[in-house]
Regions:
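Short hydrophobic/aromatic beta-strand or adjacent loop that forms the aromatic wall/cage
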Residues: 41, 142-146
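Conserved GNAT acetyl-CoA-binding A-motif
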Residues: 94-115
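A short, internal acetyl-CoA/4′-phosphopantetheine-binding micro-motif in the GNAT/acyltransferase core
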Residues: 71-79, 108-110
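Short, hinge-like loop/turn segments at secondary-structure boundaries
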Residues: 120-122, 150
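Acetyl-CoA-dependent GNAT
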Residues: 5-70, 74, 87-88, 93, ...
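Conserved active-site tyrosine of GNAT-family acetyltransferases
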Residues: 123, 128
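Short glycine/proline-centered loop/turn elements that form peptide/ligand docking sites
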Residues: 116-119, 133-143
């Protein structure tokens, strides 16, 4: 696979990929918010031969961190390096902006759901560590696990 992180993402890229991932992104209102975020924040597309394979939206969290607000990869391309390449871009952006950390929020382990078990395993494999699980962010029916990775300093 000749993968390149070549361009900024747009809302249409976001909606196209999220539509293929209903196990993770099945709430239309949330997907619309992700598409809006792709337009206003730093958003990147991984592509091959002009086809969008995955995308990532980054949000500056202030003094110390860049947050991976969204990471989505076409389901047929999981475990092929697309997500890892996007996380590497997030780390590069954090270093460029002198941010020592990259964070990500995902569904916490206290409410088991197999797709998110794979998500957490991916984030741990690329270097994130669990920091804290909270119910105050997304509600008790959707516990939020905050994960963190040091990229510099």
């Amino acid at each position: 696979m000749t993968l390149k992180i070549v361009r900024r993402a747009a809302g249409a890229d976001c909606m196209s990929i999220l539509a293929q991932l209903p196990e993770w992104f099945g709430i239309p209102e949330s997907n619309a918010e992700y598409a809006e975020a792709a337009e206003r924040e730093q958003a990147w597309v991984a592509e091959e031969s002009g086809e969008a394979l995955g995308l990532m939206v980054l949000v500056d969290q202030g003094l110390s961190a860049i947050d991976v607000h969204l990471l989505a990869v076409r389901p047929n391309l999981h475990r092929q390096g697309v997500g890892r390449a996007l996380i590497e871009r997030a780390c590069a952006v954090a270093r460029e902006l002198a941010k020592p950390y990259v964070t990500v929020k995902t569904r916490g382990p206290s409410l088991p759901y197999e797709p998110y078990e794979h998500t957490r395993a991916f984030y741990e494999a690329v270097g994130f560590e669990p920091l804290e699980e909270l119910t105050a962010i997304w509600g008790p029916e959707n516990p939020c696990l905050i994960m963190i990775m040091r990229v510099s300093g």
